[in-house]
Amino acid sequence: MRLSVIGCGYLGAVHAASMAELGHDVVGVDIDTHKVDLLSDGRAPFFEPELEELLARNVDAGRLTFSENFSAIEGAQVHFISVGTPQSESGAADMSYVNVAVDSMLPHLRRCTAGPEVVAGKSTVPVGTASRLAQTIERVGALLVWNPEFLREGFAVQDTLRPDRMVYGLPDDPGTAARAKEVMDAVYERILATGTPRLVMDYATAELVKISANAFLATKISFINAMSQVCDAAGANVTALAEAIGMDERIGSRFLRAGIGFGGGCLPKDIRAFQARADELGVGDAPAFLAEVDRVNETMRAGVVQTAKELLGDNLTGATVTVLGAAFKPDSDDMRNSPALDLATELSGPAKRVVVHDPAAGPILAKQEDRPYEVAPSTQSALEGTDLIIVGTEWREYQDLNPTQAAGLARTRYVIDGRNCLDAQDWKAAGWTYRGIGRR
């Protein structure tokens, strides 16, 4: 099938490459010339495992092209909307990119002769968006499906090609819904053939699936982080606690690792947008607990700063602090709402020096001007002469650090394990004063 993908950022680039890998003829459209040039050359504009190989293979095979012009979508049967919905000043989702994408594609629809033409929304949007857009799209004879994404950065290619479920939000009219479903089933034929569950529902429910999933994950993370504060006060171990409660099949163990909080371009934004939309619908009290989820998340950074002051002295005067990690999670170079960088920025005021290292995000960070911290080219150089190590992102290379070798580089042996990913006993045995999140 001929497909188009509107917006070639993180979501769109991965989706375009993955659909081409399934054998479709795909064109990606983006207004960013530099991004289009990179993608057209088979290069990824950001770090994501497996993506660059996928891009190069399908660009070389001629199945995947990129353009700045919306006219390039003409003739495609399915058009995926994959643009961002960033947080506005009010906390609500900024829908301007989605609206512009739809307005820009409208003149180029109804050029497909292969069958019904479908616009498939993948962007995370406030509930009610699809119904509004459907009125516009159906006026030109196309159909709208809401097909939310469930990608994890660092596993995005895997999650696209081998998803744990497929969701279609379809029109109310049974005949229209049947035609749209048939087209989407053809797009995902190879994925569905593996047994991936396909869930069919109305527009509003499909929109809520994505936003409520993110709200639930954020709640689970903040729950275990709140428990870590209780563990600190009571002398308990949050890692052992999480293991025990995670064995309850009603709870499960995933997302129960205490740390310095969640970040990225999804969870913080989405829980605030969810609250804002609920307020607009007159049910703001229903998800009001998400404000507390947000608050707990923010307080985790403050707790690390306080621990740093307890270890090095209240004013941190003369101290060098090393923050290991800049991306909000490992296997990514995404620094949006990064807890590690929040810490680096906050500590840059009182500390003499703050040095940051990240194996993927570091080179990008080094090019940024007016940052209050240094960026080290290697883990070793980041540790030289440090007084305190803070693990802010659980990259494998940080987990594999030899504490004895690290001690030979540091000036004093203090470590705050902001992701509870180090072997505490090994670090203590090497002479380090170790502090974890909810464990010692």
For every predicted segment, state its role.
Residues 1-440:
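Structural/interface elements that position substrates and couple domains in central-metabolism enzymes
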